């Protein structure tokens, strides 16, 4: 690379590619086009990759300029930096070594950090599929043909003039929202839009409603919400219903709102979204009510034969102390089953009458308000009924007008023991509330059931605790049950029934049968102490354990039990040098039955064998050094491996110390010295070395001999070997 002053005119006329655009941008950055103009450098991030930017930094540092393209400063001179400046720097505080070769490409630490951050933000590869117009605009921006300016990042199609208005530098995109179509004929340009327009832009307020099709319904609902008082019961709103009380001004202002549907959205954006959400919820609730009305009519036809719906009482609008009217309120009272049919029959009606505990008579203006509210409700119902094409039955006085579902009962309620009644039909609320006293017995039953539930949960928790302890292997079944606090009582009911059946069928000669042979045996799962009140000592397996008794095995018992489980017939045959035909003669060895080799199918035997090989390999070199053996360790390992191949590994390896593992290996070598490794016989007969090793493992000579008897049940003399069954 080298500094350039002009670009070839013929190259500019050719179609711009990504590679050529990257090269021209690199040359511009090399010449200092982005010096003191970081926005212009950020604009290059849309085209450059990480390696491309690294090349720019390297070339600028070779030209004795700061590697950061946005920095106009040159690199420090050799005298300022020092001729023998080290390449690496060791930080004693951070315990790290820093390479100063990269830092020499920049004039300061600030430029080093800024360049590293900018390079890390670039993608590893160049962009693919960039339009030629965008490439030309970007190249022109760096070469001075795109308007320049500090705000270079806006040159990719947008710009900003001094007064803040948008100036077209490339392609200008303008977002336009379609206005509401007016009445009459429109031109094709107005109906379709510009030829280069892009469809798909949806205003934010229409995203909530669901599209322009519901715009008229949304505007009507918004106008009704803003010009009327709507009280929505939160308990009924969750189930899709809302209790609404509308004033008399609703009908009068409805037409005004429909004439100017778009003027209402000229307010603040947050208020528009809030009002649209409220109106949309009301529209959906009313539509759901109309859709469910058809299902309710089928239920009403079945209920007409048994009950008829009476007309509701006229509403009473009380007057407050200050002379103003009181809003409509409703009182929900739980009644008996007899009143359920009346509520079910009137389920499809909007009843705006309320039970007001007052004696004042409503005025004529209040009656007029009620009539206007009912009239507007009819119009709303007709509007949504026509939308879903539901035919209305107007055959009787009770269902003379299209009605909506009452908001006093939740949709889908299946509680047949409750109903909704007006307070003025059953008297005062205080008198009706006395009916709840009869439910005291039910509350007592629920309390008993809760106690039983808690007891069952406690039992389940104890059983889970005992099962986890048993499955983990930390304790036996009896100990786990005892620790969990579970006491297993004998089944006295079944025992008594069994005794009665036995007494009826027994013979005269069987009177001397013991009690334990006649009934269900009561065997507790844990040891019984003398101070227990639940069982007698006679019912337990054994008496109280003596003082100082412990179930923990000693180190010798642990090693002896491990050898006892490992030895098989194949092991004895290998130790005595017998073939497979003589293995059946080793069925009884040393007065006990010697089992065959067992291998677990789940692969645990091989895992135990690999773990044992590790323990043997760790203990064998130390043992060879202490006993001064002249046999190579490799030969000892091979012979011990053949012996381990004949053993059964079913249980987990015991937890032994290194001295104890050395003693276990010594027992195996002592058994192999009889036939397989006769060179070890003089070493094994040295009592001083053997006793020293036994003392370190805390095992006596008698205990060692008992372990040898497991592998040499027929003795170690040659006469004993010759007398083996053949």
Curated annotation (Swiss-Prot):
This protein's UniProt keywords: Hydrolase, Metal-binding, Nucleus, Protein phosphatase, Zinc, Zinc-finger
Residues the entry annotates as binding Zn(2+): 66, 71, 107, 111
Transmembrane helix keyword on record: no
Native source organism of the sequence: Oryza sativa subsp. japonica (Rice)
Protein name: Putative RNA polymerase II subunit B1 CTD phosphatase RPAP2 homolog
Protein purpose: Putative RNA polymerase II subunit B1 C-terminal domain (CTD) phosphatase involved in RNA polymerase II transcription regulation.
Primary site of residence: nucleus
GO molecular function: RNA polymerase core enzyme binding; RNA polymerase II CTD heptapeptide repeat phosphatase activity; zinc ion binding
Entries under InterPro entries matching the protein: Rtr1/RPAP2, Rtr1/RPAP2_dom, Rtr1/RPAP2_sf
Top-level taxon of the source organism: Eukaryota
Catalysed reaction equations from the record: O-phospho-L-seryl-[protein] + H2O = L-seryl-[protein] + phosphate; O-phospho-L-threonyl-[protein] + H2O = L-threonyl-[protein] + phosphate
Zinc finger intervals, RTR1-type: 43-131
Family, per entry: Belongs to the RPAP2 family.
Keyword Heme annotated: no
Biased segments, Polar residues type: 220-241
EC number assigned by the record: 3.1.3.16
One GO CC term, this protein: nucleus
Basic and acidic residues bias (residue ranges): 209-218
UniProt subcellular location: Nucleus
Disordered: region residues: 209-242, 294-323
């Amino acid at each position: 690379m080298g500094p350039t002053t002009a670009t070839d005119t013929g190259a500019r006329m050719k179609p711009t590619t990504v590679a050529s655009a990257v090269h021209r941008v690199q040359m511009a950055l090399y010449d200092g086009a982005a010096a003191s103009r970081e926005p212009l450098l950020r604009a290059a991030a849309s085209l450059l990759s990480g390696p491309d930017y690294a090349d720019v930094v390297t070339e600028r540092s070779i030209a004795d300029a700061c590697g950061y393209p946005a920095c106009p400063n040159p690199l420090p001179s050799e005298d300022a930096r020092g001729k023998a400046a080290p390449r690496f720097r060791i930080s004693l505080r951070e315990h790290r070594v820093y390479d100063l070769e990269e830092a020499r490409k920049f004039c300061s630490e600030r430029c080093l950090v800024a360049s590293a951050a900018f390079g890390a933000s670039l993608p590893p590869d160049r962009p693919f599929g960039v339009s030629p117009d965008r490439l030309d605009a970007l190249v022109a921006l760096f070469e001075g043909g795109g308007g320049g300016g500090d705000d270079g990042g806006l040159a990719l199609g947008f710009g900003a003039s001094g007064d803040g208005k948008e100036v077209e530098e490339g392609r200008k995109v303008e977002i336009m929202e379609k206005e509401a179509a007016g009445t009459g004929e429109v031109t094709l340009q107005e109906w379709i839009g510009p030829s280069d327009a892009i469809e798909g832009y949806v205003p934010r307020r229409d995203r909530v409603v669901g599209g322009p099709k519901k715009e008229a319904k949304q505007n009507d609902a918004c106008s009704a919400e803003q010009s009327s008082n709507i009280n929505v019961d939160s308990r009924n709103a969750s189930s899709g219903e809302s209790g609404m009380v509308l004033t008399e001004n609703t009908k009068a202002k409805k037409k005004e709102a429909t004439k100017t549907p778009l003027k209402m959205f000229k307010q603040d954006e947050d208020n528009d979204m809030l009002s649209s959400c409220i109106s949309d919820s009301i529209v959906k609730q009313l539509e759901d009510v109309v859709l469910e009305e058809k299902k309710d009519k089928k239920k009403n036809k079945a209920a007409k034969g048994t009950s008829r719906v009476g007309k509701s009482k006229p509403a009473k609008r009380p007057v407050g102390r200050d002379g103003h009217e009181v809003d409509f309120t409703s009182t929900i009272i739980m009644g008996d089953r007899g009143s359920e049919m009346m509520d079910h029959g009137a389920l499809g009606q909007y009843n705006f009458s309320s039970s007001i505990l007052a004696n004042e008579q409503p005025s004529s203006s209040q009656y007029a308000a009620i009539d206007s509210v009912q009239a507007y409700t009819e119009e709303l119902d007709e509007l949504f009924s026509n939308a879903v094409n539901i035919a209305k039955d107007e055959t009787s006085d009770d269902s003379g007008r299209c009605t909506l579902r009452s908001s006093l009962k939740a949709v889908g309620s299946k509680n047949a023991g409750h109903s909704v009644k007006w307070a003025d039909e059953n008297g005062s609320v205080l008198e009706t509330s006395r009916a709840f006293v009869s439910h005291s017995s039910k509350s007592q039953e629920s309390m008993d059931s809760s106690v039983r539930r808690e007891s069952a949960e406690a039992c389940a928790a104890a059983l889970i605790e005992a099962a986890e302890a048993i499955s983990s292997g930390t304790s036996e079944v009896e100990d786990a049950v005892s620790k969990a606090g579970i006491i297993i009582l004998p089944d006295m009911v079944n025992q008594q029934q069994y005794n009665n059946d036995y007494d009826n069928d027994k013979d005269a000669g069987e009177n001397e049968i013991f009690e334990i042979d006649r009934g269900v045996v009561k065997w507790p799962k844990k040891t019984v102490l003398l101070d227990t009140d639940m069982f007698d000592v006679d019912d337990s397996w054994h008496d109280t354990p003596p003082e100082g008794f412990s179930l923990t095995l000693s180190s010798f018992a642990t090693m002896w039990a491990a050898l006892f489980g490992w030895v098989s017939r194949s092991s004895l045959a290998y130790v005595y040098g017998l073939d497979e035909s003589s293995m059946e003669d080793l069925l009884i060895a040393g007065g006990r039955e010697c089992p065959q080799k067992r291998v677990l199918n789940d692969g645990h035997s091989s895992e135990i064998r690999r773990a044992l090989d590790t323990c043997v390999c760790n203990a064998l070199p130390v043992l060879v050094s202490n006993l001064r053996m002249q046999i190579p360790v490799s030969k000892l390992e091979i012979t011990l491996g053949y012996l381990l191949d004949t053993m059964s590994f079913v249980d987990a390896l015991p937890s032994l110390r290194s001295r104890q593992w050395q003693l276990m290996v010594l027992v195996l070598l002592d058994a192999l010295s009889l036939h397989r490794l006769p060179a070890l016989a003089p070493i094994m007969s040295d009592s001083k070395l053997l006793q020293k090793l036994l003392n370190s493992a805390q095992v006596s000579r008698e205990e060692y001999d008992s372990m040898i008897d497991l592998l040499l049940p027929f003795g170690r003399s040659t006469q004993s070997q010759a007398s083996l069954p053949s």
